[in-house]
């Protein structure tokens, strides 16, 4: 195999003593500059050939029920959502009245790592277009993101940004898409029919100023339709953050005949792998222990995202226990319990998480893990990263105003009343 020197475009002489190594250059290496942007969908947002292992940050489908752990919803007026068991999806429905609305948003935001392409895909079927009906699907929140919108009879790709201090939506009409208008006369020859099920994709090279490609997957092929460019064009950043959520909206902006949108699947993928970074913090009970009541799940440590920081990314990583009596203890990990009593504190002002080690009760929620340990014995730390990855990321409801996030709680039940336990919990904050 000949060896090629890229710097001067020559081949090296054959030398049997040299090892010959195949190298695949990045998708943009030595390529001609294309003013309209990177149109090669076999390359990621940064032009790297898509041969690297994708790392799934989020995936959602509806095989047996509504996935309430992954999704939060807000219903206004006569709006409703219903699990469709035959089709394995969610039917989002609004009535005829102005103001009826369904909003479905993932309960987590997803970590963007600078220098790595972030690929987002959502599948759906829109309701037939009509006057006063607005439908949105994409990767966005109240403040920032990119999404597809059908408003009245018109179709747009929209960039939402709060970098100016106010929320500004920049809609690009289908007739103005800069790559393929999907009107049958574009490079793909495809005509977009939003009454049929679609796969919407977008990939981000954020870094604050990168490009965002948007498009559809048709017949197994990624078709780019519009690229939002920013580098060498803007001052500052184009959105506040690329760590956002998947979101679906169905809204009556006036009186309509009623409508149903179908929410199917979503995924968020870090292309080129993912390495969890960020500062770890921890909280623990006093060395004298937390006094437990028998026949009760005692909340020894709880976490939640702070008010104003609920789009942060924080993941519990490690738990340790020590029982002060030589008896058995049972512990549970509970998401979204209602915590009463105690004081919420934070380790330092830069932290996005607050903790409570003096709460009185934990009611409801979902038990995601439970086990036992013996007091007055060495208990190996429980490495949550190994068992759950990022699945325990702290969640929140749909953000409409500053509010605290949902809870993550460790409860302990003793063998005997007034037994004592010491627990510690370490978490990692991936946004700062």
Where do the language-model regions lie?
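Extended, solvent-exposed segments with strong compositional bias
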Residues: 352-396
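Extracellular/lumenal carbohydrate-interaction signature centered on repeated Trp-anchored short motifs
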Residues: 109-120, 189-196, 401
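Extended, low-complexity segments enriched in Ser/Thr/Gly and acidic residues that occur primarily
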Residues: 1-74, 275-327
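Glycine-aromatic-enriched beta-strand/loop faces of beta-sandwich-type recognition domains
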Residues: 134-197, 367-378, 383
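Secretory/extracellular carbohydrate-interaction modules
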Residues: 92-170, 304-312, 318-345
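Aromatic sugar-binding interfaces of carbohydrate-active proteins
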Residues: 147, 192-194, 201-287
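Noncatalytic modules at the cell exterior or secretory-pathway interfaces
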Residues: 240-250, 317-319, 396-417
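C-terminal interaction-tip segments
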Residues: 130-152, 219-224, 403-406, 412-432
């Amino acid at each position: 195999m000949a060896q090629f020197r890229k710097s001067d475009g020559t081949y090296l002489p054959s030398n049997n003593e040299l090892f010959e190594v195949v190298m695949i250059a990045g998708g943009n290496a030595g390529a001609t500059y294309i003013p309209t942007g990177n149109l090669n969908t076999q390359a990621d947002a940064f032009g790297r050939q898509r041969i690297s292992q994708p790392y799934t940050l989020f995936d959602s489908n509806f095989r047996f029920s509504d996935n309430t752990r992954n999704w939060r919803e807000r219903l206004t007026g006569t709006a409703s959502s219903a699990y469709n068991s035959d089709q394995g999806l969610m039917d989002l429905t609004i009535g005829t009245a102005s103001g009826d609305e369904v909003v479905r948003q993932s309960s987590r935001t997803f970590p963007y790592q600078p220098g790595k392409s972030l690929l987002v895909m959502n599948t759906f079927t829109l309701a037939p277009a009509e006057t006063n009906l607005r439908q949105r699907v994409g990767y966005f929140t109240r403040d920032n993101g990119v999404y597809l919108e059908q408003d009245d009879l018109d179709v747009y790709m929209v960039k939402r940004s709060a970098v100016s201090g106010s929320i500004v939506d920049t809609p690009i009409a289908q007739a103005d898409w800069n790559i393929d208008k999907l009107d049958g006369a574009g490079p793909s020859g495809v005509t977009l029919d939003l009454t049929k099920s679609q796969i919407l994709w977008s990939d981000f090279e954020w870094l604050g100023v990168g490009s965002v490609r948007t498009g559809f997957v048709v017949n197994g092929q990624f078709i780019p339709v519009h690229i939002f460019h920013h580098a060498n064009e803007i001052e500052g950043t184009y959105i506040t953050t690329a760590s956002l959520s998947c979101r679906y909206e169905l809204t009556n902006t006036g009186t309509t005949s009623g409508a149903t949108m179908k929410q199917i699947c979503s995924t968020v993928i870090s292309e080129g792998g993912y390495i969890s970074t960020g500062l770890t913090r921890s909280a623990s009970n006093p060395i004298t222990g937390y006094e437990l009541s028998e026949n009760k799940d005692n909340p020894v440590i709880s976490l939640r995202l702070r008010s104003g920081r609920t789009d942060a990314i924080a993941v519990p990583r490690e738990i340790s226990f020590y029982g002060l009596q030589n008896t058995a203890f049972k512990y549970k990990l509970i998401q979204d319990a209602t915590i009463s009593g105690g004081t919420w504190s934070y380790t330092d002002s830069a932290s996005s998480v607050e903790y409570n080690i003096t709460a009185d009760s934990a009611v409801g929620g979902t038990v995601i893990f439970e086990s036992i340990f013996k007091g007055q014995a060495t208990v190996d730390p429980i490495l949550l990263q190994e068992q759950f990855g990022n699945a325990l990321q702290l969640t929140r409801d749909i953000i409409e105003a500053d509010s605290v996030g949902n809870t993550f709680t460790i409860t302990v039940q003793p063998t005997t009343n007034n037994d004592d336990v010491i627990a510690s919990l370490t978490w990692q904050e991936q946004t700062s």
